[in-house]
């Protein structure tokens, strides 16, 4: 499993744990819902800024998005 696959899996895991839809997380982050969907499917690679924003809105430490 590569780092993008790990990130994608963890993004979805933490989003669901917080009971957020892709739409709601996108709204909180000021992103488009399709961007969140693409990240979760591993189609897009997030920028460092996007990772920072997502972790902030999910209320988790950044490193948790990259742990197997």
Go through each PLM region and give its residues.
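A detector for short, charged/polar N-terminal pre-domain segments
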Residues: 1-6
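Short basic helix-loop element that most often maps to the first helix and adjoining turn
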Residues: 9-28
